[in-house]
Structure formats: structure tokens, C-alpha cells
Amino acid sequence: MFLAWERLCTLSCRPKFLKTVWASKILGLSTSAKMSLRFKNAKRIEGLDSNIWIEFTKLAADPSVVNLGQGLPDISPPVYVKEELSKIAAIDNLNQYTRGFGHPSLVKALSCLYEKFYHNKINPNEEILVTVGAYGSLFNAIQGLIDEGDEVIVIVPFFDCYESMVRMAGATPVFVPLRCKPVDGKKCSSSDWTLDPQELASKFNSKTKAIILNTPHNPLGKVYTKEELQVIADLCIKYDTLCISDEVYEWLVYTGNKHFKIATFPGMWERTITIGSAGKTFSVTGWKLGWSIGPKHLIKHLQTVQQNTVYTCATPLQEALAQAFWIDIKRMDDPECYFNSLPKELEVKRDRMVHLLESVGLKSIVPDGGYFIIADVSLLDVDLLDMKDSNEPYDYKFVKWMIKNKKLSAIPVSAFCNAETKSQFEKFVRFCFIKKDSTLDAAEEIIKAWSRQNS
């Protein structure tokens, strides 16, 4: 009986086996080739496998390299922030899951803080969502609000994940550039880079679902003026368009400039998601905590994405962040408040970088906010003929050469551009200056020695 059943099973399986073998022979496919077709990537990530941060962080990982590339502070976070985390780690129930949309004490602190700027009550449970960094906020917003076939306006240069996330949602990024209009007799500043109102208006149509705004801007350091934001707001209202406002550098604004929140403009609260970051606020990028603020009718869709992906964020980190916020909320007019002390500290570092670059004949774009500075390296005489991949933009090859030969890391600015505009920015590199004085000293030594060699 058993043998008969075994033969029957063998016979019943054989046609399927023969069919598979026959197909393989006819198509000339090996088993590995068949598997590669079977397990090919999903279309939504087609062409998105290359990543500037993965590639250049790896190159700069050598301890001998002075890393002014990735926006990675090597200054110490505030002492009280670290102390709060240390205390909280010892509390048993704060090492377990918390509320999926944001730890209660943290959303309450965020509500209290931002009500001072929005001039209206913010419901901590319905109008704030705590996420895995600002990346998480962007992902939730785009996945929760953008549909296949929609168009999303992206301002060039842009933080690289904007384009990738829009494409993963099946939408089409529509690019509009910031254009430089320098003022005679004045150092080139990030404020010289502006949108052409008519060009911007031409990008809006019935398919436009959203515009992604970034102020203060990465990589330029541009802080949008009230008048510039009003132009964007008027177009959003006219075309019934959402605004995803990435404001992670909101506290890092330098003398003579002011940060405005577009969500506070008439008619914009109901159509705006505003994004913030713990990493940029308290110099704790490794904590990977961010938040989205907006009206309930928008935030609820971001909550749906979060509850079906990451579900919740780390409880101890959220509680420590909440306590850190309460400390600074109580002293916002005090120079010791980190929201006030950090930009003052960084403005000194910014000015140092500007002076250093000028001293060796390099033009820079002086940032009005953020902690990056862009330098024009076209005047440096560098032989890049030995670089392997000749198809890469000049700035990619330049930075790789600089890491290898000068032990100094930066980020190529063309990484922040769409394919059509890369050539306009390929002679620029971005340096990060939220660094210890000793790190900046080492960078200065490298740059000045390099300049002496070329003179």
C-alpha cells in the first residue's frame, strides 16, 4: 500500500518536474538566473539602490579621515539631556512599549512648546505624531497622503530622500530650482538663492498634490523670508495643495535672520505637515526621533502608516527627550537655553569656516541657517584622471580623491540634485561645521597645507 502510494505521488509530481526542466532548457536559464528573476526588486524601488550616505559614510569611516561630510555632530549633547536618559534607563516601566503615536509626556511637551509659535492650541494626541527621526515623518506623510499619479513639487537642491520617497509612492517629482542672484560687493550668501515666482507657479496644476519645503535649507542654509513663504502659501491655497514643511534646523538661524513657520500663515494650518527633529534640536542624531505636527484630518493618515510599519518609537529616548524639552521650555528667554546657545556657538564655527575657505581662495556660500557650508572647488587644480568611474559627476570624484589623498571628507552637492541639474552643482562640495574645535583645527591644517602645495 505504501509503495503504491509512493509511486503514485512520484508520477503525479513528474509532469511538473519535467515542465520545469524543459522550460529551463528551452530558455537557457540556470537555476540562479531563474531565482534572480523570481526575486527581482519591486518596481517601487527601481533605481533607488544607490545612496550617498551609505557610500560616503563608509569612505569616511577611517579614523585618520577628518569627517566634515555627514551632518554628524561630534560636539557633546547638553549634559542634562544625557543625564535624563541615564536616570530613565533605570526605571523599569519606561523600558517597555509606550503609546504608538508618541509617548504621552513627549507629545505634551511638544504641544506646550509649539503653541508658543502657532498661537493656537495643539492637541497632543491628535495633532502630533512622534516618528523614527524626520525620515519617519517624511515617509509617513508621503505614504499617507500621496497617491500614484500625483505630482509633488521638489525644490532643487533638496535633501536626497525627497525624490526617492515620492517615487516609491508612485508619484512624480516635479523639480523647480533655487537660482542664484548675487548682490554686487557682497559675499555670496544663501539668501541670494531664490525661487522665481513665475517659474514656481508654472509647476502647479490640477495634479499637484503637495510641495516639499525645507527651511532652513539643506544644503544651502537658506532661510526663507516671510515674503517668499507667502508666495508658496498663496499657490498652495490657489491649487488646493498640501505643504510638507521640513523644519529640522528651525533653531539654527543666524544673526539678521528669522525662521517663519508656513503653517502659521492664513489658510495654511489645515494643509501643512510640519516636521521637526530631536537630533538637530539637541545634537543627538543617534536617537532617531522626529515629529510631525498638523491638523487631525491629516495627522490621522500618518498615524495609519506608522501603526502598520514601525508602530512605536523607543520609550526611554522619548521620555528623556520630553524632560530635556521641559528644562528648556522653562528658560526660553535665557541665553543658556540650548535653543539660544547652540546657534550662537555654531555661528562662530560658521564664520571660522568662511574665513578659512576665503584664506585659501575658495568661494563659499555663507549659510543663514543650518550647520553646513558649500564651497566652490573649481579653482583647485586636482588631477582626477585616475578615478575609476568616469561617469560620476565631478564633485563625487573630487570628494573621493580628497578623502583618499588629503584625509578630509565632504559631501558632493550634486547628490542633492535631480539628473537634469547635477551639472550645475558638480563643482560644489558641502562641509559640516557642527564639530569640535579640535576637528575644525585638523581640517584647517589640511586645507592650508593643500593651499601651500598649490601656490
Swiss-Prot record:
Gene3D superfamilies: Aspartate Aminotransferase, domain 1, Type I PLP-dependent aspartate aminotransferase-like (Major domain). Substrate binds at residues 71, 218, 430. GO terms for molecular function: cysteine-S-conjugate beta-lyase activity; kynurenine-glyoxylate transaminase activity; kynurenine-oxoglutarate transaminase activity; pyridoxal phosphate binding. One of its GO terms (biological process) is L-kynurenine catabolic process. The modification N6-(pyridoxal phosphate)lysine is found at residue 280. The keyword Ribonucleoprotein does not apply. It comes from Bos taurus (Bovine). Homodimer. The modification N6-succinyllysine is found at residue 116. This is Kynurenine--oxoglutarate transaminase 3. The keyword Protein biosynthesis does not apply. InterPro entries: Aminotransferase_I/II_large, Kynurenine-oxoglutarate_AT, PyrdxlP-dep_Trfase, PyrdxlP-dep_Trfase_major, PyrdxlP-dep_Trfase_small. CDD domains: AAT_like. Pathway: Amino-acid degradation; L-kynurenine degradation; kynurenate from L-kynurenine: step 1/2. Keywords: Acetylation, Aminotransferase, Lyase, Pyridoxal phosphate, Transferase. Its EC number is 2.6.1.7, 4.4.1.13, 2.6.1.63. Pfam families: Aminotran_1_2. The lineage of its organism: Eukaryota, Metazoa, Chordata, Craniata, Vertebrata. Belongs to the class-I pyridoxal-phosphate-dependent aminotransferase family. It comes from the Eukaryota. Catalyzes the irreversible transamination of the L-tryptophan metabolite L-kynurenine to form kynurenic acid (KA), an intermediate in the tryptophan catabolic pathway which is also a broad spectrum antagonist of the three ionotropic excitatory amino acid receptors among others. May catalyze the beta-elimination of S-conjugates and Se-conjugates of L-(seleno)cysteine, resulting in the cleavage of the C-S or C-Se bond.
